[in-house]
């Protein structure tokens, strides 16, 4: 295959791919065996073999290939020139009307810090394991900054452990202020803002403690916490908006198809599993365990290839109901978006897997939402033995405190906080049924909505019960 043919290969070209390339030593064939990242028509990154040696290949095609190639090459050279630990560039080339390629040494038995973080992310905030991962990352970032460089697309997956070393990867994101001289304070604050904004908000009280790892390797500037927090908040807000935008467009995270006859959105890594589920959603619901049927919605647990899922069908009851619904986004879309919002914010909820809106010449009709199934129990069942005594397990009460604190931090109101919508799952309380959920832009509107949520939640138990009185005393208010 010629490199230029990759431009039309789509997201999942058949592997292996044999590409004829040439470097200073002459022509040779690259055999691409796996794909790690794909931006269709522009970028293909994967593992392969070149001149008998395993390599990581970055293949750049399309109109933007020359610019992307130069940016990648410049970044790699900057890292090497400043003595940073980065994979060795073995071969590179740019051919007019074909594209560009960069072949790097393949790091065997490697693990990104992103993968390492995923293993410890849900542990107690800033325990030793978390501190080790984040401290290692901050030390590497500090060393980069001492050389006048920064990683524009800074995240933990761009730091790779292999054989006792930590490698900086992705030269395309490397920027330089003045090579060899420490980065200015403003650039440091901006770049650290990008890093800390990606961490769970539960770690926010530990920012200053974590910063010590950075300052031990780069003490060039005093870093005011207020200025750093301002950068963190700015980036965090942008990242949430960007992520929510992606839930409605075709990208590496989501497969989205929209037209006059409907809208379909699926998590990219669930596409193969969810397409047949959406195609037979009604039949699966009919055969499943129904929690709610008829009226505005039907909800049921279904089994697909040994996997439990929940399907919620948003019905159109009659013509009058259709006239109220066809012109605005469906409740399925709202729940899809809000479920993804909660996951992004680190608030437990069943993962939304797929969405389908049926449309007739663009006018909305029935809609479907598929999510993971949480076995429960809900909080009514879980706390039933403790209503009279109030002796609910402290760990579960602390988890409930944390859920309410998260809602306050993010200005989230649920809209129907009855006990059957709060589930115990993996040592956390998870929210389900997000049809009325809202993230408020103003504190005043949030305070009113949260007060309603809290009052509805407390009505789950008799006001004179010990459990009610305990929760009334300890659950946070605004």
Q: Across the structure, where does each feature detected by a protein language model lie?
A:
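Conserved ATP-binding subdomain of kinase catalytic cores across diverse folds
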Residues: 20-117, 124, 136-147, 272-380, ...
């Amino acid at each position: 295959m010629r490199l230029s043919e990759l431009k039309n290969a789509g997201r999942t070209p058949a592997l292996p791919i044999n590409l004829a390339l040439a470097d200073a030593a002459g022509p040779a064939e690259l055999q691409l065996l796996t794909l790690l990242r794909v931006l269709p028509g522009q970028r293909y990154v994967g593992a392969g073999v070149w001149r008998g040696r395993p390599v990581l290949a970055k293949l750049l095609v399309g109109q933007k290939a020359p610019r992307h190639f130069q940016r990648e090459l410049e970044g790699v050279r900057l890292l090497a020139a400043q003595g940073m630990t980065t994979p060795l560039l073995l071969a590179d080339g740019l051919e007019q009307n074909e594209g560009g390629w960069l072949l790097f040494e393949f790091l065997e038995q490697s693990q990104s810090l992103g993968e390492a973080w995923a293993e410890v992310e849900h542990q107690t905030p800033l325990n030793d394991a978390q501190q080790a991962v984040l401290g290692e990352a901050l030390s590497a970032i500090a060393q980069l900054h001492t050389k006048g460089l920064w990683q524009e697309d800074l995240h933990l997956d761009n730091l790779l452990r292999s054989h006792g070393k930590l490698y900086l990867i992705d030269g395309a994101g490397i920027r330089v202020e003045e090579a060899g001289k420490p980065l200015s304070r403003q650039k440091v604050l901006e770049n650290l803002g990008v890093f800390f904004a990606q961490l769970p908000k539960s770690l926010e009280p530990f920012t200053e403690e974590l910063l010590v790892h950075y300052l031990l390797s780069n003490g060039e500037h005093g870093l005011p916490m207020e200025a750093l927090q301002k950068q963190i908040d700015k980036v965090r807000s942008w990242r949430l908006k960007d992520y929510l935008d992606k839930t409605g467009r075709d990208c590496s995270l989501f497969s989205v198809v929209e037209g006059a006859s409907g809208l379909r959105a699926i998590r990219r890594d669930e596409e193969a599993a969810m397409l047949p589920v959406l195609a037979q959603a009604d039949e699966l619901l009919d055969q499943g365990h129904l929690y709610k049927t008829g009226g505005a919605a039907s909800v049921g647990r279904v089994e697909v290839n040994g996997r439990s899922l929940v399907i919620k069908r948003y019905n159109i009851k009659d013509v009058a109901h259709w006239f109220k619904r066809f012109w605005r986004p469906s409740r399925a879309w709202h729940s899809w978006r809000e479920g993804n919002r909660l996951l992004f914010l680190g608030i437990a909820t069943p993962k939304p897997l797929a969405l389908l809106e049926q449309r007739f010449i663009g006018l909305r009709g029935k809609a479907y939402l598929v999510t993971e199934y949480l076995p429960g129990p809900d909080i009514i069942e879980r706390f039933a033995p403790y209503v009279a005594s109030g002796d609910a397990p402290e760990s579960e009460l602390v988890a409930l405190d944390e859920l309410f604190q998260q809602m306050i931090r993010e200005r989230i109101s649920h809209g129907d906080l009855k006990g059957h919508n709060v589930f115990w799952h993996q040592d956390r309380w998870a929210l389900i049924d997000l049809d009325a959920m809202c993230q408020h832009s103003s504190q005043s509107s949030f305070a009113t909505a949260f007060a309603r949520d809290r009052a509805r939640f407390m009505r789950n138990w008799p006001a004179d019960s010990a459990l009610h009185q305990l929760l009334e005393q300890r659950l946070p208010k605004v």
